Curated annotation (Swiss-Prot):
Protein name: Large ribosomal subunit protein uL16
MF annotations from Gene Ontology: structural constituent of ribosome
Entry coiled-coil feature ranges: none
CDD domains: Ribosomal_L16_L10e
NCBIfam families documented for this protein: PRK04199.1-1, PRK04199.1-4
Amino acid sequence: MPVRPARCYKRIKGPPYTREEYIHGAPMIQIPKFDMGTTSAAARTAFTMTAKLVVEERGQIRMQALEAARQMASKYLTKYVGDANYYLRLNVVPHHVLRENRMLAMAGADRLQEGMRLAFGSPAGRAARVEPGQVLFYAEFKPEHLPHIKEALRRAASKLPLPTRIVIEPKGNGGNKTVT
């Protein structure tokens, strides 16, 4: 069955539905990697700048959108910066199980199926619930790679259903922030 559009799941309605021991048939999390690039702490000491992709609205982001954004950013950085010159981390995990009340659509149907009101639905996917100001992607890099990092995060943001902003700052405790 085809996947419903993201607009069906963008808004948060009701409490989170995360208890897998009570949910039969909950889909697995389909994000294979959360850390990309140079992942060793010793090699990351050479990076002096950080960039964050910060969400600006409350909502839900499906795991397919998170995976598409991760792949887009990772492929761009691998091609133009190289795996040894950046560290990228996806900070959110899609724990919330999405439900779908499936309706039958038949060829030649002259009536619409109404179904049951307030039907609970069966598991159809997963989403991460995010709040304003929450960091979706975190990157560490050298200053000479700043344009490529910004472009990679911009491309990742284009795959997400919520508005975001990119925050650039020096690595360490605080410092001057540059919001773009």
